[in-house]
Regions:
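Hydrophobic N-terminal alpha-helices or hydrophobic patches in metabolic proteins across all domains
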Residues: 2-322
Length: 322
């Protein structure tokens, strides 16, 4: 003993991580990833092109960035000592390659968006396979949310977009009728047509707010994962997105209608109608984050009122020191 105090240092990865992913295994993982990306390069290029050309799918290129951030910030909780799982990994890689071959054969019958969606789905399956093949089942389980979140990088197929738009348009028209009545403006609704004094409003495809609602849904999923302690509260937050999106659409329709009634039908060309979407989207974030804060605050209040339960929970989470 030299009398100097012993200082414990915490490694970047848990003990055993270097042995698990080091050496040839790490390089094999990198090589497999590069090889898969090379095979799917035309699909990736089409995916980026779609994101840059279509506002509805412009968010998809951010999804891998978010997943990567979650993996990096949560790296200490990942099961780096997990053993490779060649059977499920190899099966998923082969499934992804078979899927891309089938998609290429069925290409003439598919729309541009559906083609990109299927190709990116095949790529994602192959990437999951690489994860199992080189990092193992336990690692994939510990990285469940970031890896599953990659599903959002697949563009919504045309059929899904059509059904979601129809639902949002009809629901927004129905709620708008009630909002006009509450606001004191006479209204007569027939389907998606709203007749108010001086003008007839049609809740069209552009009024569905599908892009804002979809982005809000993805935002709520991330917020629930980061800030809410239980799946139940996370589901409450995510489940509030669609009603919130419909309410946002209805309030916007009411504002446009009120402007037309008060100042003349030419107000249909007002910026609120043409370019007001981002403003109402930001406004819809306020109640969403207030709900997230309320759900999180409820947990903190419960822990403050029952410290014994929190102490028991803390003891369960402490590692065995014996």
């Amino acid at each position: 003993m030299n009398g100097n105090p012993t200082v414990e240092t915490k490694a970047v990865f848990p003990e055993g991580a270097d042995r698990s992913i080091g050496g040839g295994r790490l390089w094999a993982l990198v090589a497999a990833f590069i090889a898969i990306c090379a095979v799917f390069f035309p699909a990736i290029r089409a995916w980026v092109g779609l994101a840059l050309a279509d506002d509805l799918h412009s968010h998809v290129i951010l999804i891998p960035v978010v997943s990567g951030y979650l993996l990096v910030t949560g790296r200490m909780e990942l099961a780096w000592a997990s053993k490779p799982a060649p059977w499920p990994g190899g099966a998923l890689v082969l499934l992804g390659l078979a899927a891309i071959a089938w998609v290429l054969m069925a290409r003439p019958a598919l729309s541009v968006v559906d083609l990109v969606a299927l190709r990116m789905g095949a790529l994602l399956v192959a990437l999951w396979g690489i994860g199992f093949l080189f990092l193992g089942v336990e690692w994939m389980r510990s990285a469940l949310f970031p890896m599953a979140f990659l599903l959002f990088m697949i563009p919504l197929p045309d059929a899904a977009v059509w059904h979601l738009e129809e639902f949002l348009m009809v629901a927004s028209a129905i709620l708008s009728e009630s909002v006009f009545n509450w606001g004191g403006i006479p209204v007569y609704r027939t389907g998606q047509v709203l007749e108010i004094p001086g003008i007839v409003l049609v809740v069209a495809q552009e009024c569905s707010g599908i892009r804002a609602t979809w982005v809000l849904f993805i935002t709520s999923v991330v917020a629930a994962h980061l800030f809410l302690p239980t799946a139940t509260r996370g589901l409450i937050l995510v489940g509030a997105v669609v009603p919130l999106g419909i309410l946002r659409n209805s309030v916007r329709i009411y504002v446009i209608g009120w402007l037309c009634v008060e100042y003349g039908p030419e107000m249909i060309h007002h910026w609120v109608h043409r370019k007001g979407g981002p403003l109402f989207f930001v406004a819809s974030l306020i109640p969403l984050f207030l709900l997230a804060w309320a759900l999180k605050w409820k947990r903190k209040k419960g822990e403050a009122e029952n410290p014994n339960a929190m102490e028991r929970s803390g003891k369960r989470d402490m590692p065995d020191q014996t």
